Amino acid sequence: DWDGMIPGLQAGKFDVLMDAISITPEREKILLFSRPYAATPATFAVTDTKILPKAAPGAPIVKLSGDANADKSTVDALRKQLKGKTIGIQSGTVYTKFINDSFKDIASIRVYKTSPERDLDLVAGRIEASFDDVTYYAANNTKKDTASIVLAGPKLGGPIWGPGEGHAFRKQDADLKTKFDTAIGAAHADGTVKKLADKWFQTDVTP
């Protein structure tokens, strides 16, 4: 629950947030982040591949800069396919601005408190596409109630999402952050992050 995580951290209910949290300037104002452990691409998902074609296994990540002109060709192709559709996104994520800026004028955007709630609406046909981490879908779409959901369209990564995902700490917990930084650096250096990502997500998420 995004609404409760940061207040819970600040209140001392837990000492670190570990939930694929994208590092952003806004979040860095109130949180202390570890070095990025991953830079995860995002993608659309559908149950009807007539809306968007099923993602090709092993397809390269399309890099988005966050500049509307530079990203225009990729976004325009998606706009054409998603025109008139309803897209579901989870509230409070780094993807909200991209979806609103790129598609709000040609599609309906429905915001959900949680990703599982959104996924069930996608399966039920109440929305026609969703947008989230590639790793989220890889981990969740093996479940029986969401087995009909498939990744669709290109994997989108690059500077648009910021430096990547990190673990979040209270501002005063610099010593704990340093310990995590050391462990993350070792996992990158020996290839552990890439090995695990390739095994479980079929995508290299090394920052």
Enumerate the predicted regions with their spans.
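Acidic, polar ligand-binding/catalytic clefts
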Residues: 1-76, 148-159
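Short helix-initiation/N-cap motifs at beta->coil->alpha
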Residues: 1-7, 72-75, 109-124
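Solvent-exposed coil/turn segments that connect beta secondary-structure elements
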Residues: 2-3, 14, 21-23, 36-38, ...
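A ligand-binding cleft/hinge motif common to bilobed small-molecule-binding domains
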Residues: 4, 20-29, 97-103, 116, ...
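Envelope-exposed proteins and targeting segments
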Residues: 29, 40-42, 83, 127, ...
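Periplasmic-binding protein-like
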Residues: 39-43, 135, 142-182, 203-207
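Bilobed "Venus flytrap"/periplasmic-binding protein-like clamshell domains
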Residues: 44-106, 110-113, 134-135
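Extended ligand-binding regions for polar small-molecule ligands
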Residues: 47-69, 73, 160-203
